[in-house]
């Protein structure tokens, strides 16, 4: 018993990032050496992601409602500058992907269209309609289905009603509930090393490394664009807001948010992680409690890259010459489409046919490109989610720190 306690204390003294690195390394070894054991260990990953996905909608709803209910008149949440950064970042990602697609034209071997079962949206109007319908969804269904647009809408409305008509006791109860749910999130995050061990070992056991070799160039363009956005474009945007070296903040967000998101492959599951990081950075709670759930829905730079690169690859594969005007239009369409990716089953991949339609590519060919996307998804989806989710907290921090700098001047 004493040995067990001392072991737990010893583990507790090791930083969470180092524990995650150890879980990652062990997962690679187990998944490679014993695929059967790796698949069995996947249960830990499923439980971890399931717990995060379960608590995230409740956390967002209660935290946003509590923030609005406690909000004092005269205080501002300063959401608009963050939304502007989200849009600038997403458009920059799409434009970068267009340029990369023209400089490094990629041809792909198309997979069978039968590999894709879901139906893509028929146009941009359907994407926007999906977003608006999510806005007015039943609040219970919104929480149950992790519809964050609906959750935000109802939390804002309920919080405003409590602020104007609720008693002090009622508002305090909601605030206490928010604190309690945040504590539960901290407990879940402590299991991240075990969860990531399970996710990595099962992924390697299922796919290995050989399945991705045939699409090496496509993956190189995709990951290169995402790395360029994360390490060059985003830091430039952050510098514009805070006017000092952005890289300490950038690397903090990548390390403490991006790593989680890479392995969970879910922006929704990463919301509690981003909330905890925003609190650790000392950001304004009225701001991040709204901007981070919103970012998980509309800040989709990684999705814009995926849509654009695969659409450009489809055009090159079909022998279609893409002029600059069409490429610029593709950037705009990818930006708007990416912002609606969370409202579409299948996410960014199922919006590729919409982008392909700009080039007159048939839906049959476009769906084969989507099938290729699913093949490389083990890497593409992880990197895309890491970029999307880490950028949520990065831009929130940049806007908040920039506002503090302006106020100090």
From Swiss-Prot:
Entry's Gene Ontology BP terms: cellular response to iron ion; serine transport; threonine transport
Reaction it catalyzes: L-serine(in) + Na(+)(in) = L-serine(out) + Na(+)(out); L-threonine(in) + Na(+)(in) = L-threonine(out) + Na(+)(out)
Known InterPro entries for this protein? Na-dicarboxylate_symporter (IPR001991), Na:dicarbo_symporter_sf (IPR036458), Ser_Thr_transp_SstT (IPR023025)
Report the subcellular localization. Cell inner membrane
**Can you list the GO cellular component terms from the UniProt entry?**
plasma membrane
Primary site of residence:
membrane
Q: How does it sit in the membrane?
A: Multi-pass membrane protein
GO MF annotations, alphabetized? neutral L-amino acid:sodium symporter activity
Family assignment from sequence similarity: Belongs to the dicarboxylate/amino acid:cation symporter (DAACS) (TC 2.A.23) family.
Chain's role: Involved in the import of serine and threonine into the cell, with the concomitant import of sodium (symport system).
Quote the NCBIfam families the UniProt record gives: PRK13628.1
Q: What is this protein called?
A: Serine/threonine transporter SstT
Q: Which organism is it from?
A: Neisseria gonorrhoeae (strain ATCC 700825 / FA 1090)
User: What is the taxonomic lineage of the source species?
Assistant: Bacteria, Pseudomonadati, Pseudomonadota, Betaproteobacteria, Neisseriales
Which gene holds the coding sequence for this protein? sstT
């Amino acid at each position: 018993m004493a040995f067990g306690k001392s072991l737990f204390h010893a583990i507790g003294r090791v930083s969470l990032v180092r524990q995650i690195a150890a879980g990652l390394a062990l997962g690679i070894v187990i998944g490679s050496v014993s695929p059967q054991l790796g698949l069995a260990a996947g249960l830990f990953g499923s439980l971890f992601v399931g717990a995060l996905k379960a608590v995230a909608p409740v956390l967002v709803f209660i935290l946003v409602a509590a923030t609005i209910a406690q909000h004092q008149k005269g205080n501002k949440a300063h959401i608009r500058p963050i939304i502007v950064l989200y849009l600038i970042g997403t458009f920059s990602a799409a434009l970068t992907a267009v340029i990369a697609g023209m400089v490094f034209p990629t041809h792909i071997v198309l997979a069978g269209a039968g590999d894709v079962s879901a139906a893509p949206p028929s146009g941009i109007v359907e994407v926007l309609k999906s977003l608006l319908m999510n806005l007015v969804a039943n609040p219970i269904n919104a929480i149950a289905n992790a519809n964050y647009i609906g959750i935000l809408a109802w939390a804002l409305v309920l919080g405003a009603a409590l602020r104007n008509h609720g008693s002090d006791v009622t508002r305090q109860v909601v605030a206490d509930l928010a604190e309690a749910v945040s504590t539960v999130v901290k407990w879940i995050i402590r299991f991240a090393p075990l969860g990531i061990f399970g996710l990595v070992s099962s992924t390697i056991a299922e796919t290995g490394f050989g399945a991705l070799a045939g699409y090496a160039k496509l993956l190189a363009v995709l990951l290169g664009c995402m790395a360029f956005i994360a390490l060059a474009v985003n830091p430039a945007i952050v510098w514009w807001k805070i006017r000092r070296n952005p890289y300490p903040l950038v690397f903090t967000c990548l390390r403490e948010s991006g790593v989680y998101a890479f392995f969970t492959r879910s922006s929704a599951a990463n919301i509690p992680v981003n909330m905890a990081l925003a609190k650790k950075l000392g950001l304004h709670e009225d701001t991040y409690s709204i901007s981070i759930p919103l970012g998980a829905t509309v800040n989709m730079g990684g999705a814009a890259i995926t849509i654009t690169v695969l659409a450009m690859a489809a055009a090159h594969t079909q022998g279609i010459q893409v002029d600059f005007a069409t490429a610029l239009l593709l950037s705009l369409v990818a930006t708007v489409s990416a912002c609606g990716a969370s409202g579409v089953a299948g996410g960014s991949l199922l919006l590729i046919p919409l982008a392909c339609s700009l080039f007159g590519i048939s839906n049959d060919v476009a769906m084969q490109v989507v099938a290729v996307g699913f093949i490389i998804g083990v890497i593409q989806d992880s990197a895309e989610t890491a970029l999307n989710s880490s950028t949520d907290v990065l831009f929130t921090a940049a806007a908040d720190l920039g506002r503090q700098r302006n106020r100090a001047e």
